[in-house]
Regions:
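Conserved dinucleotide-binding and phosphotransfer motif residues
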Residues: 3, 10, 104-106
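Conserved structural-core and active-site-/substrate-pathway-adjacent residues in large, well-folded domains
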Residues: 4, 40, 95-98, 145, ...
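Glycine-rich FAD pyrophosphate-binding loop
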Residues: 5-28
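Residue-level detector of anion-binding/catalytic polar loops
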Residues: 13-15, 46, 108-109, 161
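Active-site-adjacent segment of FAD-dependent monooxygenases/related oxidoreductases
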Residues: 28, 33-104, 111, 120
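A conserved short coil-to-beta-strand element within the FAD-binding core of flavoproteins
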Residues: 112-126
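Core beta-strand elements of the Rossmann-like FAD/NAD(P) dinucleotide-binding domain
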Residues: 134-143, 147
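Flavin (primarily FAD) binding-site architecture
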Residues: 146-160
Length: 176
């Protein structure tokens, strides 16, 4: 959606095919770091996130076994960033504000409930095959960007592997 904002601002036609029918409300990530806030600022996305979140002036690394903590004062970065703090704000809020901004551009459309099930590569274009509301659809485009995560459907169709790994879960996160 952030790429859709960038393309929309430039007037480039863009269609986002999103499998989820609604933005997921569950907490996936909750911290935006200074470089991310600086980047999102260029798209007009930081201000609404700041309004919805909580600024945290420090960053901590804690050894749970001993209770020891290293505390980093992010204010020391004030000469290097416009946002010398972390922002505690649910990722779902970024999805919400980015989708709203993307859809404000006439050249952008977001198709929720669109499940990609095939690709055809041509010399100068690619055709994406997907289902939308139970109906088979196709979309011809000059460029396809797969931004669908580690289990990427798009990556699978172009035979790109994900050589990353998943770390074991070692943290309990409680929100109120």
């Amino acid at each position: 959606l952030v790429l859709a904002c960038c393309l929309g601002r430039a007037g480039v036609p863009c269609t986002v095919l999103e499998a989820a029918t609604v933005a997921p409300p569950e907490l996936r990530a909750s911290t935006f770091h200074p470089p991310t806030l600086d980047l999102l600022d260029g798209f007009g996305l930081t201000a609404p996130l700041l309004a919805a979140g909580l600024k945290a002036p420090t960053w901590q690394v804690r050894l749970h076994e001993t209770g020891e903590a290293a505390v980093f004062d992010l204010g020391l970065l004030a000469d290097d960033t416009r946002h010398p703090y972390r922002l505690q704000c649910p990722q779902a809020e970024l999805v919400r504000v980015a989708e709203r901004l993307a859809l404000s551009y006439p050249s952008v459309r977001v198709l929720r409930g669109a499940r990609v099930h095939g690709l055809e590569q041509h010399d100068q274009s690619v055709t994406v095959k997907f289902d939308l509301n139970g109906q088979a659809q196709q979309l011809a485009c000059a460029l396809l960007v797969g931004a669908d995560g580690g289990r990427s459907v798009v990556r699978g169709y172009v035979s790109e592997r994900f050589d990353g790994e998943t770390y074991p879960e070692t943290t309990l996160l409680a929100t109120t």
